[in-house]
C-alpha cells in the first residue's frame, strides 16, 4: 500500500502594523487598491476585477468602492488603523475608493496625488475614431 502524504498548511502570520499606505491606481478600465506598510511591503490588495466585475463595470465608482472595502477588511485583520492614500491615474474610482476606506474604519491621514505627468516624453497614441 502506498503511503499517504500529508501536506502541512502554513497559516499567514498576523502582522501588527498600525500605520500603512493605500496605493490607489485608478485607470479608465479598472481600479487597483494595494495597502502596504511604510516600507512598501504589501499587506493586502484588491481590484474591481478580483471582486467579480467584468468589462466596463470594472471602471465604475461602485466597483472601486467594493474593492477598497475588501482590501481594507483584509488589512484591518493585520491591525491596520491609519493609512496615507496615494492616488494615481485619471479613473472614475478615485474618490469612491478613498471614501470607502474611511467608511470601512480606517483613518485617512494624508491624500496625495502621485499621477505621473510627462515633461513631454513619449508621443501619445493616435486619437480614436469611433
UniProtKB/Swiss-Prot annotation:
Biological process annotations from GO: translation
Leader peptide range in chain numbering: none
UniProt keyword annotations, A-Z: Ribonucleoprotein, Ribosomal protein, RNA-binding, rRNA-binding
GO CC terms, sorted: ribonucleoprotein complex; ribosome
InterPro entries per record: Ribosomal_uS11, Ribosomal_uS11_bac-type, Ribosomal_uS11_CS, Ribosomal_uS11_sf
RNA-binding as UniProt keyword: yes
UniProt key word Disulfide bond: no
Function: Located on the platform of the 30S subunit, it bridges several disparate RNA helices of the 16S rRNA. Forms part of the Shine-Dalgarno cleft in the 70S ribosome.
Listed name of the protein: Small ribosomal subunit protein uS11
Lineage: Bacteria, Bacillati, Bacillota, Clostridia, Eubacteriales
Amino acid at each position: 500500500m502506498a503511503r499517504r502524504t500529508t501536506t502541512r498548511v502554513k497559516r499567514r502570520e498576523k502582522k501588527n502594523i498600525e500605520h500603512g499606505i493605500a496605493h490607489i491606481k485608478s485607470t479608465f478600465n479598472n481600479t487597483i487598491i494595494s495597502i502596504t506598510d511604510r516600507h512598501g511591503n504589501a499587506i493586502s490588495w484588491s481590484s474591481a476585477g478580483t471582486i467579480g466585475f467584468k468589462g466596463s463595470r470594472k471602471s465604475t465608482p461602485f466597483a472601486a468602492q467594493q474593492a477598497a472595502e475588501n482590501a481594507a477588511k483584509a488589512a484591518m485583520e493585520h491591525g491596520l488603523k491609519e493609512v496615507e492614500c496615494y492616488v494615481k491615474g485619471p479613473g472614475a474610482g478615485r474618490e469612491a475608493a478613498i471614501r470607502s476606506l474611511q467608511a470601512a474604519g480606517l483613518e485617512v491621514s494624508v491624500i496625495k496625488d502621485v499621477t505621473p505627468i510627462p515633461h513631454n516624453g513619449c508621443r501619445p497614441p493616435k486619437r480614436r475614431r469611433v
